[in-house]
Amino acid sequence: LLDLETIVSYIRFMSNFSQPHSPEQRHRGRPREFDLERALDGAIKVFSRRGYHATSVGDLTDAMELAQGSLYKAFKDKKAVFIATMERYRIMQTERFEAAVAGFDTGYERLRAGLMFYAERSHGGVGSDGCLVVGAAADLAALDDDIAVVVERAVKARERIVARLVAEGQKDGSVRSKADPDDLARAMLCMMYGMRVVGKTGRSLKDMVAVVDIAMRLAE
């Protein structure tokens, strides 16, 4: 289980994002909490590119634009930074994924939109940045138990969403495959995460769309 102090620190940290600020505070400029939110976005980039173990505290202070003292005031250690970063990344990516699959009429179309969500992030510059969850999952055996729990939770959460899309498609008849939704979701997730890995090697969007086309045959 996660260290209680880490959980409490993260909840307190994230709750600051929604706190209202007085006109005087807004007039003085952007509050510190929002600077820390931006700092976590910097941490997402460096952890995604370098991985947990290869990222030093110096890398984090540079990416987050924080002095080392400020970093340790906000977070207990590098592990706490990573856990907070992973949680922020998971929340943001879930919202973006759900938005990407919304608005389509059938489960099949929503499933394809989910695959395209990954294809569009697996080429060019954004592809070379990598995916925080995929990178951490690949390094899971070398991570400690607290971090492994966070990574596993992120992977399983995405798998549940994909399984829901499969089930919706089977219900409306657009997904003709009779495979168990959970099994098909795992296969699709392997394709999605695989695109993020291959995308780090400099592939084109056309390459990734071809993967989507093949993956969707599993649903036919």
Model-derived segments and spans:
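Helix-turn-helix
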Residues: R38, G42-A80, A84
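Amphipathic C-terminal alpha-helical segment
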Residues: R121-G124, R164, E168, M188-K206, ...
